[in-house]
Amino acid sequence: MDMAGLKACATTMMILVASIAPGATKSPVADAVMNGDKTALRTLLQQKADVNAPQVDGATALHWAVYRGDVDAVNQLVRAGATIDAANREGVTPLAMASLYGQAAIIEALLDAGGNAKQVTANGETLVMFAARNGNPAAIKLLAGAGVDVNAKERLRGTTALMWAVEQRHAPAVKMLVELGADVGARSGPAGLPRNYMAPRVDTTAVEAAARRHAAAAAAGRTYNEQLEWEAAHGVKISLGFRGTLNADGTPARVDNARRPFGQPAAPAPAPAAAPPPDDAADDADVIVAGLVGAGGGGLTPLIFAAREGDLESAKYLIAGGADVNQTSEYGWTPLLTAANNRHYKLGAYLIEHGADANLANKGGWTPLYLATDNRNIEGGDYPVPKPDMDHLEFITVLLDHGADPDRRARDNTLTRTIFTMQWFYENGATPFVRAAQSSDVELMQLLLDYGADPFIATENGDTALTASAGIGWVEGVTYERSPGDNVDAVRMMLDLGLDPNASNKEGRTALMGAALKGRNEVVQMLVDRGAKLDTRDGGSRDTDNSVSAIAGHRWQAIDYADGLVRVGVQSAITRPETASLIRKMMTDRGLEVPPANRVMESICVVSICQERVWKD
């Protein structure tokens, strides 16, 4: 958050409340400082007015002097007996505000006057963390010199001041913290959403709170909406602090997120029961939350934060301070993987130059090479796509030159996959070559071949680079393709390499079926000319259970895909009349049985179980 944002928060906290109830308390000194009226302040101090009289929200004159950055007013108030560590109703002290604003001169004045540098928030956030977020090295040095532990972790996410500075891209603050002994290898605590937390500033709080609400609703036998209505009627709100223990009626039996004053230590946690019952409600709730939110995230280091933010300068200070360039998060994200995922290729190249392993993969099996390939051919979606700071192909070449294995296989769909694509193309086992082929990225495919890529490696579901390029997994308006011309060239390349035009995946789908669904006549013709069979049948689409398909005759041919009878994944079927005409002609020329044109789904019993066969297998 920048200075304008910080002051906006303070304004909301102090001015708004005061404006709601003017005159609710008598605080002329605070009012004078709030208004910047130096003459009135001088007069009031001469009259021995109470410098500690708070406004309605608890803000004192010293709070306002800090907010305005008025060092002279701070010194005048201190000499007049202002309480240094007075807290407003939010528990915020003047020293905390000065730390958040990075006001080194005011911090020094307050510390000299006896301010408590070791005060912490309810979540364990220290004043050094506040100063790190602002980025003023001088403020950080003053607070650390006053005894604040630079390696303390806040309790909500387990982050340190060094992580806060890196997350805000404050390289000078990072340098100062490293010099003061900050742990460059510290790890954040566990977190939910393990596959998604690498995106900058993902807010998992709302997701987790919703998950715990689902858990509470399930325990009480209510729907989610009924739970919301029940909470509103009973004045209950299940939030992040809710641990899941419920009363018999579904009310939270314990809520541990009550606010306490800034600097006051948290109450000790109650001792755990010696032997919790097997059906403990908290355990049940946590199981539900784990399924809704996820597990295995967290464990981010300062260098991983720097890689996520693309902060090359901070990364340099961290590496110079001894950070391991191959450290991993709980999910297996390395700094290099993180930089590649977020398209911070210059930082990635720097990491490689300093020993980063180009082949380390996370638990999803994603390598820097696979992610860079995916980034170059990103599919359409409702998410922002950052611009890379280096050409994709240039970075990929850097990876390959430093030993990246072009045949390393992914184990899971990448973050960019939408629900549409994942429904009928599974990346488990896909190589960078298969991913490049899916988008007909001929230039990258050739580069990978030049570095020894094996074009014959298929996915665990049996899809080859040929089936992927031809159209298996294609989602209209979503899947990215370099161009229709590149699609023809990619298919030709793979046929020339010797890939089997009749190879099918575990659903029985072939390259010809994919080309028919896409409506690519030139590809269809090329595949048939190279031996692709027109009468091959798949294992049945989502509209017919596989066990019924064999009985009802609903195992589809390429012509059915072109006729728009086959729905794949969650997308609707698409009719390709010109492609259907071409396939019918080729089937007729070869003496194959040709199904009638102008068919619709209901006419061949796709919606309900068929009563009779339409054709023989």
Predicted regions and their residues:
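Ankyrin repeat A-helix N-terminal signature
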Residues: D31-N35, W64-D70, M97-Q103, F130-N136, ...
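Ankyrin repeat domain, specifically the short helix-to-loop turn at the C-terminus of the second helix
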Residues: L45-D50, N75-T83, E108-N116, K141-D149, ...
